[in-house]
Amino acid sequence: MSDALLSKTDRLEIGADEYRLRRERVFRLLAEREIDALCVFGPTRVAYLSGFFFSPTERPVALVLTADGRVAALLPNLELSHFQQQGPKLDDSAMYPEYPGGGSGRHPLLFLRDLLSRLGALGKKIAADVDGYEHRWGYRGPALSAVLEQPVHADVALIDDLRMVKSAAEIALMTEACRWGDHAHRLMQDSIRVGSEELLISHGASLQATRDLLAELGGRYVPKAREGLPANAMFIRGSNTAHPHGLHEAGAVALGDVLVTGAYGVVGGYESELERTMIVGEPDAEFQRYFAAMLAAQQVGFDALRPGRTCAEAESDVRRFIRDELGMDDLVRHHTGHGFGLEGHEHPFLDLDDHTVIEPGMVFSVEPGLYVPEFAGFRHSDTVVITVSGMEQLSLYSRELDDLVVAG
């Protein structure tokens, strides 16, 4: 089938019907909580509910949903045609010329106040994900409650709780994203040599993986961002890996370097996550000891995930194993994992203080790490989906040491 003849159902993205069902869930939630209108400012939350993906800037965008089922939006003029191309039909809208005013003499949130007035929401119960637009790219603005001169119930959980359990369509997109994250990692691993430049190998593999993705998927692939590539891989090396989020360093790969990698795909706006610990040349006894400990801890994390347990209970299993069986609790720097989907990190978290109940359809990273100061970090991360009885890995790259040795 030629790209020109592809129907929207063939494209790798969430369809209009699912976006409509998401908004209907919000309408019911508003009615149950006796909330008259909800203002959604977070760009990812706007996209989740409307299908409108955009590049967030200093110009506020807000989606407004009302308990009686109306959909409206605050938009800068420069995004109007973009919203019309992607988003649902609106019952009302407020367009402003520019930020901070574009000659209108009015802050954009005053246009939102006018919109809420037309919707009959002023003076009634209004909620929002956050109390006003986030401060990015030089934006300055008042809280929504100050503009409206009334309380606003601000709660990110109103939308983010709905995002925790993924639909079949979301899981399919993330499964495809995992496939391309795995592919990017393979290209990168196969390109690493002693003397390789860390940055050049990382970016070269990402570009080649993206070329492969576009060649295979063609018009089925629908980009959802202005920045970044659909398939990505990177690594850091040596003692820098002892920092869980160490930055890139200039220089070349050397014999004996420990490598901690990261790779992911993005399909339909949904991400994957894959990380591996590798070694350049033959691993010595010290490396093998920590690698085996990390691998065992990750397996405990896999085994801990099943419906009905809490995130804290799963994390407790991992931390208990690292403390009591490995005697390495002092090498832990972070929790075992996190949810994700449209964002690289999403609620909930596999953390001792997150008591969210695990449900089928949730997607997590599982990535307990051990960090040995001035030596190296040891961390695998895999994308998993919760099933009715446990979990299933979506990232399929080998976890075993024999497959993660780079020839010296």
Predicted regions, residues:
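Active-site neighborhoods and metal-handling regions in enzymes and metal-associated proteins
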Residues: 1-408
